[in-house]
């Protein structure tokens, strides 16, 4: 989760005192990197995935499942057995926000050959097996986006009570600080977001109104005036960073051949973010209730919203410099490529001084405004040992701001003094239950980048429409019911060349008829006379590539999953979870997920992930039979 400096974190007051210093030197660090590597060309498209995991413990006797707060120990063991012993170890492990979470990536990035698509799932399996092997009895590693009873009494092992007093990090009524990773960055981030904002974060998720759900659904918090004021009727109220950053996701990073190719990919993939988010929907439950959303995006956005009342437009600007329209965790606000410029229709708040400085240094308008927009934010954490840095050889101040702008896409300059290229990160996906599904989504997105670059595809639409798509994508059953703005003609005779656009696209105003509302089924699978469909385009690309039979078979299985999820033939994880709860004998049709129901659901998820049972409605019939059995969590093992 971004920069992980070691050392002594400064208080919020001290961090604030150094904010201008961090911004000033962050820009100098960016300029050093930019001038050193702006002409760097890489031959190979490298890429890698990141999977976030939750550690859980099953109490089979009392039919209860809890989040296991030993991520630190598990991580230490995995790193000791892996990368510290062998620098070429096939997996890498990193800490995540929750003390019940870990993040796993392949040890080396994948390269440009088609056969590498066949190694993704094997590597994910290796990660799952490796981490599971260091767990105790009745413990399991799960790829679940949101734990349904996160924030309910006794949801952690060991159990801890929340401490809503000022001294803590979260001050939450529901989320104990012990559930936050012990690395000083995470607790400090949590505390400083709250201090900067001037109050606790506020998350209100609409409740799903079932037959017996009270109407209006109202929770009262007599002991907490802040919560009483912030919570809304018919909404599930949450008050801590952990409710967002304590969820798991699936991300992919690509190294492009050049800075211009990275900027082009950044823009093209930004329009794909809401589509893939809806396709990967996997988080319908929050704080023990069934919600009316299927994706975590808005929850995580609110969970780290450090904007003050002035910045949110609730009070006149007095102490702050800017009105800021979005949380630091949200969709992108500007395209970076020349082709994207005319579609930049969102008002962009920028630091004008930084913008002018970047222009003077020879950086073009589009990249300058992107960086000047990121740098309207304050640093949220600062370590005493990391204040004075060598700007020519270090980038911690730049990364401090860059890595706490959590957007749908991230444009990543190379680290100083490395041979890494310009990268983009694709960030909106929800993690799936199985390695097969996670591989399918990763391979789909990576293949799409290949096709975008090979066929010079153009998905650009006004950025305000992408934002509208993001709102639709989070709704319940968006994959089947949502309509999304999408470009009609994506193959304009190879207009979208990487280093600029041809004359055919030079009109300054995007035409409204360039895009229209489509269903995800149309976007993914195509509709005659309307849109060719992304999967048919991927298939035609594959037909023209040299691909061995085995790899082709794997890729086609992955694309079949995406195709069937888009058409509704297979369920999303979110829909499947909703059906599971609705059909549970203990469910009272009141939108409440009890310990017993939660246990049944997570146990079932674990069995599906370990391939101990089939789930045709999620994965298709005839999906692989059990490959291995008797995981450590199994009561009969």
Swiss-Prot record:
Reaction equations catalysed: L-cysteine + L-glutamate + ATP = gamma-L-glutamyl-L-cysteine + ADP + phosphate + H(+); (2S)-2-aminobutanoate + L-glutamate + ATP = gamma-L-glutamyl-(2S)-2-aminobutanoate + ADP + phosphate + H(+)
Class of enzymatic activity (EC top level): ligase
An annotated Gene Ontology molecular function: ATP binding
GO terms under biological process: blood vessel diameter maintenance; cell redox homeostasis; cellular response to fibroblast growth factor stimulus; cellular response to follicle-stimulating hormone stimulus; cellular response to glucose stimulus; cellular response to hepatocyte growth factor stimulus; cellular response to insulin stimulus; cellular response to mechanical stimulus
GO cellular component: cytosol; glutamate-cysteine ligase complex; mitochondrion
Functional note: Catalyzes the ATP-dependent ligation of L-glutamate and L-cysteine and participates in the first and rate-limiting step in glutathione biosynthesis.
The protein's assembly and partners: Heterodimer of a catalytic heavy chain and a regulatory light chain.
Homology family: Belongs to the glutamate--cysteine ligase type 3 family.
Record's protein name: Glutamate--cysteine ligase catalytic subunit
Gene name linked to the record: Gclc
């Amino acid at each position: 989760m971004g920069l992980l400096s070691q050392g002594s974190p400064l208080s919020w007051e001290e961090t604030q005192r150094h904010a201008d210093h961090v911004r000033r030197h962050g820009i100098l660090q960016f300029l050093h990197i930019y001038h050193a590597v702006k002409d760097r060309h890489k031959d190979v498209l490298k890429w890698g995935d990141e999977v976030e995991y939750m550690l859980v413990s099953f109490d089979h006797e009392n039919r209860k499942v809890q989040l296991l707060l030993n991520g630190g120990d598990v991580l230490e063991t995995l790193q000791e057995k892996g990368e510290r012993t062998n620098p070429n170890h096939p997996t890498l492990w990193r800490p995540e926000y929750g003390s019940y979470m870990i993040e796993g990536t392949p040890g080396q990035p994948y390269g440009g050959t088609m056969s590498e698509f066949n190694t993704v799932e094997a590597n994910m399996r290796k990660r799952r097996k490796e981490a599971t092997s260091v767990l105790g009895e009745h413990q399991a590693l799960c790829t679940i986006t949101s734990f349904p009873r996160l924030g309910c009494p006794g949801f952690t092992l060991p159990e801890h009570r929340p401490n809503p007093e000022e001294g803590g990090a979260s001050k939450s009524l529901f989320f104990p600080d012990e559930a936050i990773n012990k690395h000083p960055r995470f607790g400090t981030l949590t505390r400083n977001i709250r201090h900067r904002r001037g109050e606790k974060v506020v998350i209100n998720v609409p409740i799903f109104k079932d037959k017996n759900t009270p109407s209006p659904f109202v929770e009262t918090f007599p002991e907490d005036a802040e919560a009483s004021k912030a919570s809304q009727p018919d909404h599930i109220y949450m008050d801590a960073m952990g409710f967002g950053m304590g969820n798991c996701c699936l991300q992919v990073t690509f190294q492009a051949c050049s800075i211009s190719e990275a900027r082009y990919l950044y823009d093209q993939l930004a329009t794909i973010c809401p589509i893939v988010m809806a396709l990967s929907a996997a988080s319908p439950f929050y704080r023990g209730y069934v919600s009316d959303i299927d994706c975590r995006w808005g929850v995580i956005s609110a969970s780290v919203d450090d904007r003050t009342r002035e910045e949110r437009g609730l009070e006149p600007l007095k102490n702050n410099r800017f009105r800021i329209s979005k949380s630091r965790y949200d969709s992108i606000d500007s395209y970076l490529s020349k082709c994207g410029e005319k579609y930049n229709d969102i008002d962009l708040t920028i630091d004008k001084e930084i913008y002018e400085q970047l222009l003077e240094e020879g950086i073009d308008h589009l990249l300058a405004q992107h960086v000047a927009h990121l740098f309207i934010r304050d640093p949220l954490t600062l370590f005493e040992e990391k204040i004075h840095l060598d700007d020519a050889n270090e980038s911690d101040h730049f990364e401090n701001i860059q890595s706490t702008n959590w957007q749908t896409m991230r444009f990543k300059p190379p680290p100083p003094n490395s041979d890494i290229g310009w990268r983009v990160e694709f960030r909106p996906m929800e993690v799936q239950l199985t390695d097969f599904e996670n591989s399918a989504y990763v391979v789909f997105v990576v293949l799409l980048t290949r096709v975008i670059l090979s066929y010079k595809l153009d998905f650009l639409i006004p950025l305000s429409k992408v934002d509208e798509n993001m709102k639709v994508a989070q709704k319940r059953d968006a994959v089947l019911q949502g309509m999304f703005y999408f470009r009609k003609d994506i193959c304009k005779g190879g207009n979208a060349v990487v280093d600029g656009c041809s004359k055919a696209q030079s009109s300054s105003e995007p035409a409204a008829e360039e895009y229209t509302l489509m269903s995800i089924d149309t976007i993914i699978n195509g509709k005659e006379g309307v849109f060719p469909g992304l999967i048919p385009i991927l298939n035609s690309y594959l037909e023209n590539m040299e691909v061995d039979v085995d790899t082709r078979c794997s890729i086609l299985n992955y694309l079949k999953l995406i195709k069937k999820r888009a058409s509704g033939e297979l369920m999303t994880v979110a829909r499947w979870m909703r059906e599971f709860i609705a059909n549970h004998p203990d469910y009272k049709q009141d939108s409440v997920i009890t310990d017993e129901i939660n246990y049944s659901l997570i146990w079932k998820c674990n069995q599906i992930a370990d391939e101990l049972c089939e789930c045709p409605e999620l994965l298709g019939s005839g999906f692989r039979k059990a490959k291995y059995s008797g995981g450590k969590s199994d009561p009969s093992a």
